[in-house]
């Protein structure tokens, strides 16, 4: 029986992209796209093996950003514009990690959605 041929991933040559950092209270997801929004690379704290409350740490966000940047640099990426969404603790450390990984950060934009008093928020925790 013939083996099914796997599609080899095409290496794009893109120099400018957008790094989307989604920092929630539980996890940090870093996705690097081209200017049209087509994904080049992504990583998250959970995908790197962090579990439970360790996913929400700044160190986990830093590791996720480094992994995504390394993967995106294989496509020839050099400069990124950063969009940050969410209130999580990994916002600043993820941006610093992108810059430290060798990507030039040209702009940082906060796109956290702010409700015009929409849905009722979850009740306050009593610990």
UniProtKB/Swiss-Prot annotation:
GO cellular component, one term: ribonucleoprotein complex
Gene coding for it: rpsK
Keywords: Ribonucleoprotein, Ribosomal protein, RNA-binding, rRNA-binding
Binding partners and assembly: Part of the 30S ribosomal subunit. Interacts with proteins S7 and S18. Binds to IF-3.
Superkingdom, taxonomy of origin: Bacteria
InterPro entries: Ribosomal_uS11, Ribosomal_uS11_bac-type, Ribosomal_uS11_CS, Ribosomal_uS11_sf
Classification via Gene3D superfamilies: Ribosomal protein S11
Gene Ontology biological process terms from the UniProt entry: translation
A GO molecular-function annotation: structural constituent of ribosome
Function recorded in the entry: Located on the platform of the 30S subunit, it bridges several disparate RNA helices of the 16S rRNA. Forms part of the Shine-Dalgarno cleft in the 70S ribosome.
Family in the record: Belongs to the universal ribosomal protein uS11 family.
Listed name of the protein: Small ribosomal subunit protein uS11
